[in-house]
Amino acid sequence: MTSQLAKKAEAWSARFNEPMSDLVKRYTASVFFDKRLALFDIQGSLAHAAMLAKQGIIAEADRAAIEQGMAQIRQEIEAGTFEWKLDLEDVHLNIEARLTAMAGDAGKRLHTGRSRNDQVATDIRLWLRSEIDNIVGLLRALRGALLDLAEQHTNTIVPGFTHLQVAQPVVFGHHLLAYVEMFTRDTERMLDARKRVNRLPLGAAALAGTSYPIDREFVAQQLGFDGVCRNSLDAVSDRDFAIEFCAAAALVMTHISRFSEELVLWMSPRVGFIDIADRFCTGSSIMPQKKNPDVPELARGKTGRVNGHLIGLLTLMKGQPLAYNKDNQEDKEPLFDTVDTVVDTLRIFADMVPGITVKADAMRAAALQGYATATDLADYLVKRGLPFRDAHEAVAHAVRACDDLRCDLADLSVTQLREISGLGDKANLIGDDVHAVLTLEGSVASRNHIGGTAPEQVRLAIVAARAGLAG
């Protein structure tokens, strides 16, 4: 690393009597992670230069030289030939130094009316806005993949669980639509967070604004911001937008993690509801029979990492006085890693979902266990005039009897159901039509209302979700 330390004075070194040590340079430099902001730094600088020229703060010839130099720097960065220097601390001074080497005094004039404080805040917002747009697109792709799978399984019955115990039958498409709802809310949260990201800090300078006659609204328009940050102190020190994004990202990963947990369970041979395509799984170095769902497992693990970044950013900001502090340099790595993790995870899951093989027979067999239609029997009795609590008790008696007989409610005859219900002279409420409500199909079909698991409602929900996807 020492060989990378150029023997040039820092941009601010005229104030000091001795140079920084190599160790301190390495400790305080950020260029090797914030260089990913480079193209956005160029974008912001070009808009700033255009404003300076428009306002007569720099000459048009200087603006043209800056634009020409930045075009060359962009080419070098995209080609991977740009020489990043640790001695120049960060992405901003590296680009400025290269620009000055090419454009001379014009390059030195670029920083007129701005500080690295408002410059970096602008770069991060430009970058994060772009990444949010990418994430929103990936969320829509995942929602679309889930809808495609749900559409294939509007009649496939699977047990619904509470406490991981069989509760009531649902159609598998309905189960998948629950995740569509989660990822729809995630999309909305991302778009809402984008509103706070899309404000321009540039013009706040170090903390108090600038004495030059700048036009902040012009720069905001050039860069596609909705408006400007209204307080210069807040503009350079605010990282709420990054925290808010990380909170939204943590919820994305939480929903991915919940889905992953179910995929792992469903793929287990003891459950056997699904299979995941080989390209998303790994084997064992010792057990030749293994096919491990590593992608869902890793997604569960990476969720903790993203959650940790959120807590890290909250902790980073909680003790900072106004305005900018060097602490804020530590916002970038957790933010960058959060974006990378969410983007990679969503991209993989959108690719993985279409290849899921659903084992409908296994799902149905599981739904036939655990007395999944017990609630339907209770509802049947209520509809015939029995108070719900009495109906609940009667069905509980029947379930206990089935435990002893090792059979399901649907296996009992009408006579047996009457005898074991404990209803006494009200046992005749159990009629010859009772078995219709004890079937899986009858159970799911009866939930025929908005948000219910009836196949008809699930198909309508898919249509509505697709309309929301297109909107």
Curated annotation (Swiss-Prot):
* Gene3D superfamilies for the chain: Fumarase/aspartase (C-terminal domain), Fumarase/aspartase (Central domain), Fumarase/aspartase (N-terminal domain)
InterPro entries per the record?
A: Arg_succ_lyase_C, Argininosuccinate_lyase, Fumarase/histidase_N, Fumarate_lyase_CS, Fumarate_lyase_fam, Fumarate_lyase_N, L-Aspartase-like
State the UniProt keywords alphabetically.
Answer: Amino-acid biosynthesis, Arginine biosynthesis, Cytoplasm, Lyase
Question: What is an example of a GO molecular function annotated in this UniProt entry?
Answer: argininosuccinate lyase activity
Catalyses: 2-(N(omega)-L-arginino)succinate = fumarate + L-arginine
Q: State where the protein is found.
A: Cytoplasm
Q: What class of enzyme is it?
A: lyase
Q: What is its EC number?
A: 4.3.2.1
One BP term from GO: arginine biosynthetic process via ornithine
Entry's family note: Belongs to the lyase 1 family. Argininosuccinate lyase subfamily.
- Which PANTHER family does the annotation name? ARGININOSUCCINATE LYASE
- Name the chain's protein: Argininosuccinate lyase
UniProt source species? Ralstonia nicotianae (strain ATCC BAA-1114 / GMI1000) (Ralstonia solanacearum)
Q: What is the lineage of its organism?
A: Bacteria, Pseudomonadati, Pseudomonadota, Betaproteobacteria, Burkholderiales
Quote the gene name from the UniProt entry.
Answer: argH
